[in-house]
Amino acid sequence: MSFIVPEEIEGYAEAHTTPPAELLAELAEETKATLDSPQMLTGKIEGRLLEQLVHALQAKRVLELGTFSGYSSLSMAAGLPEGGHIDTCEVSEKHSEVARRYHARSPYGDRITIHMGPALETIERLGGEWDFVFIDADKENYANYYEALLPRLAATGLMAIDNTLWSGRVLDESDDEETTRVIRELNDRIVADERAIAVQLTVRDGVTLIRRR
């Protein structure tokens, strides 16, 4: 599914991206067939992007907000260095059940921990700094997640926030739907934040990468 770029460009990019492992392809099919809102699946291109970022950073401590069916956590796990670990937060038992099954079948099952419950509570409980953070949970809390985690990025750490173009709806100032407004306000906050350096990418539904100054 393409959210921003034309379908034919998305298809070309997918065709020139290293294909996902068979287990990820199987997970994608099950997600589309059995779960509500399958468009929430990270997908081939963004999954590889996350893996590349984790690998390039040699990120040992990774935090994900929003496990969904486990595609993104498995993608990132493939880029972990020796001793690296992913903590991922989820509130849906149905989603986490799928993720746990596929994590267990992968080579990375012992390197991913799913934490059930509100992400802000998990963030506070886990403590410490993070080498890489991927935010893809409830949009209404995006600003809270950003504020909680920006100070806790490692000196060379990176934060990735998903869906920051929101199918292009952020462009329409007359669109006052709550999620659209929340994302638009967050985008404005990030670019004006003197603590951060950000780039917004037109990958999938928009991915914003942020580091601390």
Task: Tell me the role of every PLM-derived stretch.
Residues M1-F132, K139-A160, T164-R213:
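A short alpha-helical cap/connector motif
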